[in-house]
């Protein structure tokens, strides 16, 4: 990622959304439950925990204790995740989601997404409501992971007849939203000022954050039931600042937003706070500003 357009560059990493598994037939007791172990693909584009490698590249990683929400059966307005599995691996390119699932049959299909805590509600048409927070908590080097929604395409499972174990390899995910990188630039008076809050406001009808109704089977956004045209980053530690020693490293604000396009001529507003200053800048776009879904843009 190396160019900045109107002080704003967008990055989103592609990830495929296909997975399947097959095991032996199994008359497993629903009370005893089925033990799931799901290994994610080793594709480094699966997860957007962005570690900067100091060479212009970024290595996406899963973190230990990441949570995967899985859904088995019909989804309606009363639905909650059938189970939540936990990554038992240390931080790395591959996650192993592990957990016991009760009340399900010996075989079937499941839908899933991470992180599980983004789940808000189910809908009668089979979609799930997933929250993309208006106020986010990134660090100086990475997005707020809680906002990076990754959906896996529906996968099949079949438990081992003796052990009740399900092992699934190479579960691939699709990123639902777009990552925005804003490089902080300002007058000399702001040099060495550390940002505590920074926001991006788009035109009124633009949707940046809110609650999306997502079809987990197709990994698509059906509609937004709650929508905001703003996104705000807040910091308590590990915050970016102005005039840092390492441009594009310690002077960067990261957001996660709804994919879309803001047309030429529209106005966007950047605003923020440091310990000593508040600042606002309105920018009129000379060309379209696009936040792409699941792809890399510079």
Where are these regions (language model features)?
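Sec-type signal peptide cleavage vicinity
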Residues: 2-298
């Amino acid at each position: 990622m190396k160019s900045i357009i109107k002080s704003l560059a967008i990055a989103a990493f592609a990830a495929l959304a296909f997975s399947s598994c097959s095991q032996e037939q199994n008359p497993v007791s629903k009370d005893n439950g089925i033990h799931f172990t799901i290994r994610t693909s080793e594709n480094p584009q699966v997860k957007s925990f962005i570690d900067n490698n100091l060479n212009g590249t970024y290595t996406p990683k899963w973190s230990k204790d990441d949570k995967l929400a899985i859904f088995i059966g019909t989804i309606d307005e009363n639905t909650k995740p059938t189970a939540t599995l936990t990554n038992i691996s240390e931080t790395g390119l591959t996650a192993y989601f592990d957990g016991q699932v009760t009340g399900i049959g010996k075989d079937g299909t499941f839908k899933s997404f991470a992180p599980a805590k983004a789940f808000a509600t189910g809908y009668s048409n089979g979609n799930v409501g997933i929250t993309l927070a208006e106020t986010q908590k990134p660090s100086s080097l990475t997005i707020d992971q809680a906002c990076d929604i990754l959906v896996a395409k529906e996968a099949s499972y079949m438990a081992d007849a003796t052990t009740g174990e399900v092992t699934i390899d190479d579960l691939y995910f699709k990123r639902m939203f777009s990552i925005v990188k804003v490089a902080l630039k300002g007058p000399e008076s702001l040099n060495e000022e550390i940002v505590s809050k920074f926001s991006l406001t788009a035109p009124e009808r633009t949707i940046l954050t809110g609650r999306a109704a997502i079809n987990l089977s197709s990994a698509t956004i059906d509609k937004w039931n709650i929508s905001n045209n703003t996104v705000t980053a807040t910091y308590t530690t590990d915050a970016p600042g102005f005039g840092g020693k390492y441009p594009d490293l310690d002077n960067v604000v990261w957001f996660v937003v709804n994919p879309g396009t803001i047309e030429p001529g529209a106005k966007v507003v950047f605003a923020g706070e440091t310990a000593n200053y508040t600042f606002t800048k309105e920018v009129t776009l000379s060309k379209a500003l696009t936040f792409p879904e699941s792809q890399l843009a510079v």
